[in-house]
Every structure is written in structure tokens, then in C-alpha cells.
Regions:
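Short hydrophobic alpha-helices and adjacent helix-cap/hinge residues
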Residues: 1-175
Length: 175
């Protein structure tokens, strides 16, 4: 059963800190424990890449089997060491970024495709530019179609295979 969600974050990145805050508020409502660890700063005060494998080991020791990688420029830049360290510790990475599944070792991505988000933005822009609407009059729109991508090589390594009905709607890739 899914009881713990891991998160590595960088408090010096606003997006990363916001995601930590959001998950801190959301996980108790879902009955899930959030195990969040900050990426250790190095001697320069910037996040230390070498701390990523150490933090993954800590997450494993705390019983984390699933890890969320959200918005973090630092972790995205170091996605290869991030995802491979997770897999080495038996932790599955879930992310909204398809490239982590396609080009690294994340297990699963559920994401709005960029072209769909661009289409929504264009529709909103047309309402403003062509139809003369004020931006404040427009409702907030959200993507309704999502891409499900799963890395089957990682699924095999972790022995975490998705249900068959999920595979019918997901795109399975091998890195």
C-alpha cells in the first residue's frame, strides 16, 4: 500500500519550496505521509549534487518507495543522478516532466503536453485580442487531456508493473 511519498527539495528555489508547501498541505488529506528532505548545501551555499545519492539512501531508510520530482531547476539539471540514485535505492520517481521518463530513470509521468497548454493559452489570448475581453473577465482554464508515460525498463528493475488497464492508456517507453 502507498503510505509515504518522498520529496527532495531546494529551499533556495521558489518553485521547489512552493511544491514542498503544497505537498505538506495535501498529503495529510490523502492519508499519506510526506517524507521531505532538503538537498544539502555545499561549501558555496548552493545545493550539492553529491548529496543527492545520500538523500536517496535516507529516503529508503525512512521507508519511501515513491518519490515526487516537481519543479526544481537544480534537480532537473541533475535528473540523471537523481533518477538513477532513486532506482538504485528501490524508489520509483513520479514527475510531471516526460523527459525524466524518456531520457532518465523516472518510472512515471502524468503531464499536460506543452502543445495542449499552448493551445489553451492561444485560446485565451484570442478572447482578449480578438474579442476585446478583459483578462480579469476570463475564467481560469486547465488542461483536461494528460499524457501518461511509463518507463518499462525502470518498472522491471523496481518490480513495479502498472495494472493492465493503465497500460492501455499509457505510452510505454524503454530508455
Amino acid at each position: 500500500t502507498f503510505r509515504k511519498l518522498g520529496l527532495l527539495y531546494n529551499r533556495n528555489e521558489k518553485n521547489s519550496a512552493v511544491k514542498f508547501q503544497e505537498l505538506s498541505e495535501l498529503t495529510p488529506k490523502l492519508g499519506v505521509e510526506l517524507v521531505a528532505l532538503e538537498v544539502e548545501p555545499g561549501s558555496t551555499g548552493l545545493p550539492d549534487v553529491a548529496s543527492i545519492p545520500l538523500r536517496m539512501k535516507e529516503l529508503k531508510e525512512k521507508g519511501v518507495r515513491w518519490l515526487y520530482l516537481g519543479s526544481s531547476s537544480f534537480l532537473d539539471k541533475n535528473r540523471e543522478i537523481f533518477t538513477s540514485s532513486a532506482v538504485e535505492n528501490g524508489i520509483a520517481v513520479v514527475s510531471p516532466y516526460e523527459r525524466l521518463v524518456r531520457k532518465s530513470h523516472a518510472l512515471l509521468s502524468v503531464a499536460a503536453r506543452y502543445q495542449d497548454v499552448g493551445r489553451l493559452a492561444a485560446q485565451q489570448a484570442l478572447k482578449i485580442l480578438r474579442d476585446g475581453k478583459k483578462p480579469s473577465e476570463l475564467p481560469i482554464v486547465r488542461a483536461t487531456d494528460f499524457a501518461y508515460v511509463i518507463n518499462m525498463e525502470v518498472a522491471k528493475k523496481l518490480n513495479r508493473f502498472p495494472p493492465f488497464n493503465f497500460l492501455q492508456i499509457a505510452e510505454a517507453v524503454k530508455k
